[in-house]
A protein has these predicted regions:
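Active-site acidic catalytic loop and adjacent metal/ATP-binding pocket
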Residues: 1-3, 7-8, 167-220
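Residues forming the ATP-binding cleft of Hanks-type serine/threonine protein kinase domains
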Residues: 11, 52, 64
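Active-site activation/catalytic loop segments of kinase-like enzymes and analogous catalytic loops
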Residues: 218-270
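Conserved kinase catalytic-core helix
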Residues: 36, 67-111
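An alpha-helical support segment within catalytic cores of ATP-dependent transferases
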Residues: 97-188, 199-201
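Short pocket-lining segment of the protein kinase catalytic domain that shapes the ATP-binding cleft
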Residues: 59-67
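A conserved alpha-helical element in kinase catalytic cores
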Residues: 6-49, 77-90, 220, 229
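Short beta-strand micro-motifs within the conserved protein kinase catalytic domain, predominantly
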Residues: 47-57
Length: 271
């Protein structure tokens, strides 16, 4: 009303086989975590959020591009540097949040990253099976001709890596070290530009989509974000010290082995 613009996420349970139980849980968690952070770090989250329609609709403040907000990394290098530094500062601050175990369980903030990533056997499958390596190399070679130059270089790096078992073994060792890390830092757990609204004029930064929030090892949020920035073609060298190298290693096998799965088809899920 009164010309106010809001952002809305809705779960249509009729489209989902389990009546949307999981997705409704995500909306509930997103709202609850946002409200929790409004009390401690209000500058980092939406100013207003509310569940409606028996939990099927999540409404929140809208940070529209017409009001100066960016939902993609800035194209200007100097602004991009401010953007990256601001995000890194924010995720560092969020890591300090300490909550009682009862609240962690109530909000479903239990750790999962080290188990899901560090104990994933994707990298070991790649090392052990020459056919898997050949299939991966073939896939990347097929991608090469139609890629931008920067992505062609990245594909070539992966192709060369897949030919070097010693380097793959080192990555496997580092990934297993990630599984041993303490998960004592609060993390958004999906820190990427799609979930960030940045206002270059005011320097404000808002993180949205808190349904993956959890406790994780130190540097997890920065690592997620810097990988996303590199994917967008930004130079992240000044922030290499922020990376959790073992987490980065765990990404390699996790995503490579899953790239062999058949392409997703339209179905009864949201992603």
């Amino acid at each position: 009303s009164g010309g106010r613009t809001i952002f809305v996420k809705e779960v249509d349970a009729n489209l989902l086989s389990d009546e949307g139980e999981r997705e409704l849980g995500w909306l509930k968690k997103d709202c609850a975590v946002t409200r929790l952070l409004q009390k401690t770090y209000p500058q980092y989250v939406a100013d207003w959020t509310e569940l409606a329609d028996d939990g099927h609709v999540l409404m929140m403040s809208s940070y529209a591009s017409s009001d100066g907000w960016l939902w993609q990394p800035p194209t200007d290098n100097s602004v991009a540097e401010r953007y990256i530094s601001t995000v890194i500062t924010e995720v560092r601050e969020l890591e300090k949040i300490k909550l009682p175990q009862e609240l962690i369980e109530e909000l479903q903030l239990q750790p999962f990253a080290t188990e899901k990533l560090g104990l994933d056997d994707g990298i070991d499958q790649i090392i052990a099976d020459a056919d898997v390596r050949r299939r991966l190399i073939d896939n990347y070679q097929k991608l090469l001709p139609n890629q931008l130059e920067i992505n062609q270089r990245r594909c070539q790096v992966i192709i060369e890596l897949l030919k070097k078992r010693d380097e793959l073994t080192d990555i496997s060792v580092r990934a297993k070290e990630f599984a041993k890390q303490t998960e004592g830092c609060f993390n958004h757990s999906d820190v990427r530009s799609d979930n960030l609204a940045f206002n270059p004029q005011t320097g404000e930064l808002k993180l949205v989509d808190w349904n993956w929030a959890s406790y994780a090892p130190k540097g997890s949020g920065a690592t997620e974000f810097l990988v996303d920035m590199a994917r967008h073609g930004h130079d992240v060298m000044p922030w290499l010290g922020e990376l959790n190298v073992e987490m980065l290693a765990s990404f390699v096998g996790f995503y490579l082995i899953r790239s062999l799965r058949p392409p997703l088809k339209p179905g009864d899920n949201l992603r």
